[in-house]
Amino acid sequence: MFDIFTRVVSQADARGEFISSDKLEALKKVVAEGTKRSDAVSRMTNNASSIVTNAARQLFADQPQLIAPGGNAYTNRRMAACLRDMEIILRYVTYATFTGDASVLNDRCLNGLRETYVALGVPGASVAAGVRAMGKAAVAIVMDPAGVTSGDCSSLQQEIELYFETAAKAVE
């Protein structure tokens, strides 16, 4: 996992070049948006339990067969595993948001996750629906204008939405 700064330096070093002015401008923008990024991660972290719980409630309301006898989330153990997995995905989305780099999400969370779910008989479409519900809830919390750094957060919103969509597609 590299943060955006390490990645830019590594790429320039590999090419034997100085960091280009366009890369420097992009890094300046990241620094300028650092407070917004930190606020977003803080909000997702502080509301992680409600994000996961509400997404799970929505998923099970939309797909009640999951919690019916014989369903993939039937029994407390399976339900707990489902909630744990949703929480792990959310945690890695916060890491990606904080660093501005999806590699931590892809490499340490999503890599091989679909294959694991297939092997366990977990319906990927249901997991994806839960992840998308978490994404909507997280973005709503992040974009709530009360008590955060003012300014345009649309690019950060799109980035967070992309991380959740990447996670959803990885398990479908």
Swiss-Prot record:
InterPro entries, A to Z: Globin-like_sf, Phycobilisome_asu/bsu, Phycobilisome_asu/bsu_sf, Phycocyanin_b
Bilayer topology term: Peripheral membrane protein
Keyword set, alphabetical order: Antenna complex, Bile pigment, Chromophore, Electron transport, Membrane, Methylation, Photosynthesis, Phycobilisome, Thylakoid, Transport
Cited SUPFAM superfamilies: Globin-like
Function: Light-harvesting photosynthetic bile pigment-protein from the phycobiliprotein complex (phycobilisome, PBS). Phycocyanin is the major phycobiliprotein in the PBS rod.
Pfam families with a match to the protein in the record: Phycobilisome (PF00502)
UniProt GO BP: photosynthesis
Modified residues (N4-methylasparagine): N72
GO cellular component terms attached to this protein's record: phycobilisome; plasma membrane-derived thylakoid membrane
Modified how: Contains two covalently linked bilin chromophores. The chromophore on position 82 is added by the phycocyanobilin lyase CpcUS, while the chromophore on position 153 is added by the phycocyanobilin lyase CpcT.
Species of the source: Picosynechococcus sp. (strain ATCC 27264 / PCC 7002 / PR-6) (Agmenellum quadruplicatum)
UniProt keyword Electron transport present: yes
Compartments where located: Cellular thylakoid membrane
Residues holding (2R,3E)-phycocyanobilin 1: C82
Name listed for the protein in its UniProt record: C-phycocyanin subunit beta
Sites where the protein binds (2R,3E)-phycocyanobilin 2: C153
Oligomer status and interactors: Heterodimer of an alpha and a beta subunit, which further assembles into trimers and the trimers into hexamers.
Gene3D superfamilies (UniProt xref): Phycocyanins
